Amino acid sequence: MNFPKELMYTESHEWVKIEGDKALVGLTDYAQSELGDLVFVNLPEEGDEVTAGEVFLDVESVKAASDVYAPLGGVIEEVNEELLDRPGWINEAPYEAWLVKIGEISDREKLLTAEEYEAVVNSEKE
């Protein structure tokens, strides 16, 4: 299991790469491995406002449909439209296959370091 140290994480298994007042968001390696092969990604619209901790998109795998929670508050600035045609990219390269870019970010204080997130994953595996 891979936990890049330069990223931040959530307990609901999203990764966050903060770049100034913007952030890229994706699903962690653990999330994609638990979901199985992804077959569909339902992305939000650019310009949508999101609230930290609330559902803002969903993904479907061969196992189930799953909600994805916004790790931060802000405004959707960009969505990764490549995932609409290639949702399996998340399984292949979870830390490259970002879902959205959020601008005007807020509510960073609940994000976890790689070490904190690894402890969350290890406790879920037990």
Curated annotation (Swiss-Prot):
Cellular component aspect of the GO annotation: cytosol; glycine cleavage complex
Details of cofactor binding: Binds 1 lipoyl cofactor covalently.
Keyword Transcription included in the entry's annotation: no
Pfam family of the protein (one): GCV_H
Domain Lipoyl-binding positions: 22-103
Modified residue annotations for N6-lipoyllysine: K63
Entries under CDD domains matching the protein: GCS_H
Keywords recorded for this protein, A-Z: Lipoyl
GO biological process, one term: glycine decarboxylation via glycine cleavage system
Cofactor(s) annotated in UniProt: (R)-lipoate
Subunit structure: The glycine cleavage system is composed of four proteins: P, T, L and H.
Family statement: Belongs to the GcvH family.
Function: The glycine cleavage system catalyzes the degradation of glycine. The H protein shuttles the methylamine group of glycine from the P protein to the T protein.
Protein name: Glycine cleavage system H protein
Organism: Clostridium kluyveri (strain ATCC 8527 / DSM 555 / NBRC 12016 / NCIMB 10680 / K1)
The gene coding this protein: gcvH
